[in-house]
């Protein structure tokens, strides 16, 4: 199995998982359950509910539970629970929808409900016990599926766009053509729009745009119309209209003037 397909399979399993966290704590089917020892890189689809699990330590043995959250463009956030005083404390936690799954004295896991692009970052759960400290970290990468569009522009040029994907999608053409340009537009939320423009010879009737992305691949086809023409700009169209109207006005003016002078000459001859 290729690496991209393996990664897609992992993402699908994460987004559809109803497994329990390590330690025997059952999660509902509305959550994607993420579990591993140490530090892992974890891709997660946007708009799902994710649960990040603490190390599997019996709650009766814990002293303090701390979640450290480092997000892009945000100060470091800390969520802590102290068992002795049954107190919870938060520091610099401004991003919404990141909470304890339930009461931390019953479940020390963290939930993100639902995931969006602001939740990209590093999450570490630390459990302090009489036997030492245990931690589990997650490098969370939020994935956004791009919207794919394909259309024909001027002449016989096909344009394929993968709109607001995260990370940037890759575009290829079938059959292969001489790509005129590939542009990437970056947005503030971390998504990227990729636009590929490809001209084709007149004998090509149908072309296919293939978009590759970590969330899955997609292909669209379009039938090329060799007779399709579009004006260069609205200003050019306006100038053409004005030119036609002006020409018509001049013709009417000349005709009216000719008739007028003919009548004057006729009156002079009669007199």
Swiss-Prot record:
Q: Which UniProt keywords apply?
A: Disulfide bond, Glycoprotein, Immunoglobulin domain, Membrane, Receptor, Signal, Transmembrane, Transmembrane helix
Query: What cellular-component terms does GO give this entry?
Result: external side of plasma membrane
Describe the location of the Ig-like C2-type domain by residue ranges: 133-221
Chief subcellular site? membrane
Provide the Ig-like V-type domain boundaries.
46-132
Localization annotation: Membrane
Q: Keyword tRNA-binding: yes or no?
A: no
Q: Which residues lie on this side of the membrane: Extracellular?
A: 24-239
Do you know which Pfam families this protein is assigned to?
A: C2-set_2
Task: State which ranges are Cytoplasmic (membrane side).
Answer: 261-271
Which Gene Ontology molecular-function terms are recorded? signaling receptor activity
Q: Identify its membrane topology class.
A: Single-pass type I membrane protein
- Gene3D superfamilies xref list: Immunoglobulins (2.60.40.10)
Q: What InterPro entries does its record include?
A: CD200R (IPR040012), CD80_C2-set (IPR013162), Ig-like_dom (IPR007110), Ig-like_dom_sf (IPR036179), Ig-like_fold (IPR013783)
Q: Does the keyword Amino-acid biosynthesis apply?
A: no
Tell me the protein family, please. Answer: Belongs to the CD200R family.
Report the function annotation for this chain: May be a receptor for the CD200/OX2 cell surface glycoprotein.
The name this protein goes by in its record:
Cell surface glycoprotein CD200 receptor 2
Q: Which organism is it from?
A: Homo sapiens (Human)
Highest classification ranks of the organism: Eukaryota, Metazoa, Chordata, Craniata, Vertebrata
The gene name on file is: CD200R1L
């Amino acid at each position: 199995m290729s690496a991209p397909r393996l990664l897609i399979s992992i993402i699908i399993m994460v987004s559809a998982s109803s497994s329990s966290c390590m330690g025997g704590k059952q999660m509902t089917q509305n959550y994607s359950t993420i579990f591993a020892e140490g530090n892992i890189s974890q891709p997660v689809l946007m708009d799902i509910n994710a649960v990040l699990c603490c190390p599997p330590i019996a709650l009766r043995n814990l002293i303090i539970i701390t979640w450290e959250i480092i997000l892009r463009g945000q100060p470091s956030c800390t969520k802590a629970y102290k068992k002795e005083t049954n107190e919870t404390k938060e520091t610099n936690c401004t991003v919404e929808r990141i909470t304890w799954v339930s009461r931390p004295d019953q479940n020390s896991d963290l939930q993100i409900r639902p995931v969006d692009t602001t939740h990209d970052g590093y999450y570490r759960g630390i459990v302090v016990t009489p036997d030492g400290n245990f931690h589990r970290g997650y490098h969370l990468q939020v994935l956004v599926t791009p919207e794919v569009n394909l259309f024909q522009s001027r002449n016989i040029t096909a344009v394929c766009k993968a709109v607001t994907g995260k990370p940037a999608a890759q575009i290829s053409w079938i059959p292969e053509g001489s790509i005129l340009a590939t542009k990437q537009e970056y947005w503030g939320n971390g998504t990227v729009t990729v636009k590929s423009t490809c001209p084709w010879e007149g004998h090509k009737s149908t072309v296919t745009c293939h978009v590759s992305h970590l969330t899955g691949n997609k292909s669209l086809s379009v039938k090329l119309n060799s007779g399709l023409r579009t004006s260069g700009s609205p200003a050019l169209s306006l100038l053409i209209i004005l030119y036609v109207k002006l020409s018509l006005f001049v013709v009417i003016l000349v005709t009216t003037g000719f008739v007028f002078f003919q009548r004057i000459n006729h009156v002079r001859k009669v007199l």
